[in-house]
Design a protein with these regions (language model features):
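Conserved HGGG/HGGXW glycine-rich cap/lid loop of the alpha/beta-hydrolase fold
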Residues: 26-82
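Conserved alpha/beta-hydrolase catalytic His-Asp/Glu region
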Residues: 143-149, 164-226
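Conserved loop-alpha-helix segment in the C-terminal half of the alpha/beta-hydrolase fold
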Residues: 228-264, 270, 275
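Conserved catalytic-core motifs of eukaryotic protein kinase domains, centered on the activation segment
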Residues: 54-56, 80-86, 145-147, 244-245
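Active-site loop/turn elements of alpha/beta-hydrolase fold enzymes
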Residues: 74-77, 138, 263
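Flexible "cap/lid" loop of the alpha/beta hydrolase fold
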Residues: 121, 125-164
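Alpha/beta-hydrolase fold catalytic core
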Residues: 1-43, 64-67, 135, 172, ...
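Active-site loop/oxyanion-hole signature of alpha/beta-hydrolase fold enzymes
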Residues: 8-10, 21, 64, 70-111, ...
């Protein structure tokens, strides 16, 4: 799970709610701390089990360039209300949510991290046309390898549980292993408390359905390339989700800009925020030129 190193919001950043025709979405809204907001705004989409807080380390730096930056919780994540119907978490439905939020916030640039990249791609394939699309640590198709095995274990653990009991099973999962893993990874007490609150707030139906989406996603790179949206593929040199070779090849098929972030793994926004923010600002500025 993506783990922020700090929960302190940058200057100019506030928690808010984005109202759309498809519902309300919890958000962090960052504006330049000083100077005008003259550049195109950006919308950031988190990954599986993630949230808007995953972007705290880069929000201030991105906004400082002179643009509004909004990060959201997807439907069923943390502080955004979920759907009880599994169909509400199909990539197409989540993509439609993103389009609605992008329109409400007048976003020019769209970024999706990990699973959020698949969601952002779905929005573009359904007709949304941002000034640019960034796929951050996201791949062309289903999640492979060890991360896929983790999802299979999660699904096996929750399989057959009555809907009314799912929240309890998620809590067992958190207290049984995930909390210990977070502490072992070096998260301090306030961050561990946040991770606990976030995990237990996730809609269990969403957790299950999004996991299945990650395991079954089709390669739609060629369809995305046909949309001709300026695209940026950005990932850490030690990404342990989609192999870096897959992301490199996806970038080539998309004729996309590509940057590999030194010293980062699956969460460059947390592990190398300054380098990541610089790369994004450079790409977004070029897309607006």
């Amino acid at each position: 799970m993506s783990t922020p190193t700090s929960l302190e919001l940058p200057e100019g950043t506030r928690p808010t709610t984005v109202e759309t025709a498809r519902g309300s979405f919890a958000a962090l809204d960052a504006m330049p701390d000083a100077g005008p907001c003259e550049l195109g705004s950006a919308l950031l989409i988190p990954g599986y089990t993630g949230s808007k807080e995953d972007f705290i380390a880069i929000l201030g730096q991105l906004a400082a360039a002179g643009r509004r930056v909004v990060a959201i919780d997807l439907r069923g994540q943390y502080q955004t209300e979920g759907a009880d119907d599994p169909g509400g978490y199909d990539l197409a439905e989540l993509g439609a949510d993103v389009t609605a939020v992008a329109e409400a916030t007048e976003a020019s640039h769209l970024l999706g991290h990990s699973f959020g990249g698949l969601v952002a791609r779905a929005a573009v394939l359904d007709g949304y046309s941002p000034a640019s699309l960034t796929l951050l640590s996201s791949g062309p198709a289903a999640l492979p390898g060890a991360r896929a095995e983790e999802l299979h274990r999660l699904l096996n653990y929750l399989d057959g549980t009555p809907t009314a009991d799912l929240k309890g099973k998620v809590a067992e999962m958190w207290y049984g292993s995930m909390k210990r893993q977070a502490v072992k990874a070096g998260a301090d007490a306030p961050v561990v408390a946040f991770l606990e609150e976030r995990m237990l707030a996730n809609n269990p139906t969403g957790l299950i359905t999004m996991a299945n989406q990650l395991l079954k996603a089709e390669d739609r790179t060629d369809q995305l390339a046909a949309r001709s949206v300026p695209t940026f593929v950005l990932y850490g040199e030690d990404d342990n989700a989609w192999p870096t070779t897959e992301q490199r090849d996806m970038a080539a098929r998309l004729n996309a800009e590509r940057t590999c972030i030194p010293g980062a793994a699956h969460n460059p926004n947390v592990e190398a925020p300054a380098t990541t923010a610089h790369a994004l600002t450079k790409f977004w500025n070029a897309a607006e030129a």
